[in-house]
């Protein structure tokens, strides 16, 4: 009897991580089942940022639905506008002018750098390195300025639209992007100097959150999470859209599938994006930036000041929208976080019948349980950082 009393009763400890935890990157509520300091189970509770985007889109016409895509993953805005615009264009069957395609690709790669700078530097901040975070935001500020000059908004640009882009690049912007691209390589080097061979950084990332190639495919991972496990799948190469098939770039691939591999891939992807930006600036042709179809493209501001017909045309287009032929399409782009897909169904009216959004972060968050099992609490923070999760797109 006394022996039984002395036997220590083991009981797992349940802890709430978030939703107001600084390392949760938004509104993640994570219920952790702990054995001491080791994680037995991680149960993510999502939906705290659910806004009913997919339903709201059904009440808007095709052009009015576009700004919702900026607000999903609010770190990589134009990549999502791109997916939606491509989907609408596929249903309309329209061919986008070459210049518009180059501008789109240029800004999608600027968006990729914006996203990866945020991902790598906030990941470092979570692990305890403050300096790269401050450097990264200095560079992001310059890129945000390019967004602002081209669209008028720093974040929610609504710049890439079905049929092309909303307006041409202003004078001098190409030169400034070129100047940025020339100096940004050395900024990446600085971040790498501080992190890549740093002993503490490697101790916190190497062999943490390992994902095998089979697991990555089974859980539906995409983007960096898939390439980190050794699978060279990038939609820009495998299913090229716009002018990606005319540009040269490499796909960085990991070997071990741990947090460190994914960090290295993000850094290398920033370098590849620089390469693509340079090619876009060099190859960009002159010409129009919208489809020459008056049913889809609004008239220019200059025409609206001169012509009453143009003003009426603009008003009708923005209030009633345009009808899209009956059909359905699934269109995906390689967003910075992974495969961002739009399943769009048209019933022939001016509003989408259904718009299903496939967000990459949703699949990645599902894998948090198996990735953090057997690791310490501190490593959960590292794993959330490496998954690069933004809740706007997870909860939608």
UniProtKB/Swiss-Prot annotation:
Q: What role does it play? A: Core subunit of the mitochondrial membrane respiratory chain NADH dehydrogenase (Complex I) that is believed to belong to the minimal assembly required for catalysis. Complex I functions in the transfer of electrons from NADH to the respiratory chain. The immediate electron acceptor for the enzyme is believed to be ubiquinone. Component of the iron-sulfur (IP) fragment of the enzyme. Component of the iron-sulfur (IP) fragment of the enzyme.
Q: Which SUPFAM superfamilies has this protein been placed in? A: HydB/Nqo4-like
Q: Which UniProt keywords apply?
A: Electron transport, Mitochondrion, NAD, Oxidoreductase, Respiratory chain, Translocase, Transport, Ubiquinone
What InterPro entries does this protein's entry cite? Answer: NADH_Q_OxRdtase_suD, NADH_UbQ_OxRdtase_49kDa_CS, NDH1_su_D/H, NiFe-Hase_large
- Per the UniProt entry, the Enzyme Commission number(s) are 7.1.1.2
Pfam families the record matches: Complex1_49kDa
Any GO CC annotation of this UniProt entry: mitochondrion
Reaction equation(s) it catalyzes: a ubiquinone + NADH + 5 H(+)(in) = a ubiquinol + NAD(+) + 4 H(+)(out)
Q: Which GO terms describe its biological process?
A: mitochondrial electron transport, NADH to ubiquinone
Its primary localisation, in coarse terms, equals mitochondrion
Question: Where found in the cell?
Answer: Mitochondrion
> Which GO MF terms does the UniProt record name?
NAD binding; NADH dehydrogenase (ubiquinone) activity; quinone binding
Q: Is the keyword Transport in the record?
A: yes
Cite the NCBIfam families for this sequence.
Answer: NuoD, PRK06075.1
- Into which EC class is this enzyme placed? translocase
Name the protein family: Belongs to the complex I 49 kDa subunit family.
Tell me the protein's name. Answer: NADH-ubiquinone oxidoreductase 49 kDa subunit
């Amino acid at each position: 009897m006394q022996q039984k009393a002395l036997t220590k009763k083991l009981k797992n400890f349940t802890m709430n991580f978030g939703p107001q935890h600084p390392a949760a990157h938004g509104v993640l509520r994570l219920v952790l089942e702990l054995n001491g300091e080791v994680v037995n189970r991680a149960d993510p509770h999502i939906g705290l940022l659910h806004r009913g985007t997919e339903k709201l889109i059904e009440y808007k016409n095709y052009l009015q639905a576009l700004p919702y895509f900026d607000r999903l993953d609010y770190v990589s805005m134009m990549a999502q506008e791109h997916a939606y615009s491509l989907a609408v264009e596929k249903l309309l069957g329209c061919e986008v002018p070459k210049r518009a395609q180059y501008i789109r690709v240029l800004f999608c790669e600027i968006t990729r750098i914006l996203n990866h700078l945020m991902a790598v530097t906030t990941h470092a901040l979570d692990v305890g390195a403050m300096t790269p975070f401050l450097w990264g935001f200095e560079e992001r500020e310059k890129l945000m300025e390019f967004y602002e000059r081209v669209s008028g908004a720093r974040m929610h640009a609504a710049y890439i639209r079905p049929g092309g882009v909303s307006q041409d690049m202003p004078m001098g912007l190409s030169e400034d992007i070129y100047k940025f691209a020339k100096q940004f390589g050395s900024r990446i080097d600085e971040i790498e100097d501080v992190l890549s061979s740093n002993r503490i950084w490697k101790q916190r990332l190497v062999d943490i959150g390992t994902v095998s190639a089979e697991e990555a495919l089974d859980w539906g991972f995409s983007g960096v999470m898939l390439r980190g496990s050794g699978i060279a799948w990038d939609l820009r190469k495998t299913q090229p859209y716009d002018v990606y098939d005319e540009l040269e770039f490499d796909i960085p691939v990991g070997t071990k599938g741990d947090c460190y591999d994914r960090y290295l891939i993000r850094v290398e992807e920033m370098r590849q994006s620089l390469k693509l930006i340079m090619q876009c600036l060099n190859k960009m042709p002159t010409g129009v930036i919208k489809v020459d179809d008056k049913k889809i493209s609004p008239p220019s501001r200059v025409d609206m000041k001169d012509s009453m017909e143009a003003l009426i045309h603009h008003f009708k287009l923005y209030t009633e929208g345009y009808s899209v032929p009956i059909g359905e399409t699934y269109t995906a782009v390689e967003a910075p976080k992974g495969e961002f897909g739009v399943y769009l169904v048209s019933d022939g009216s001016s509003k989408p019948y259904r718009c299903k959004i496939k967000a990459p972060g949703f699949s990645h968050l599902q894998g948090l349980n198996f990735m953090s099992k057997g690791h310490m609490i501190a490593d959960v923070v590292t794993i959330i950082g490496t998954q690069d999760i933004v809740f706007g797109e997870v909860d939608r």
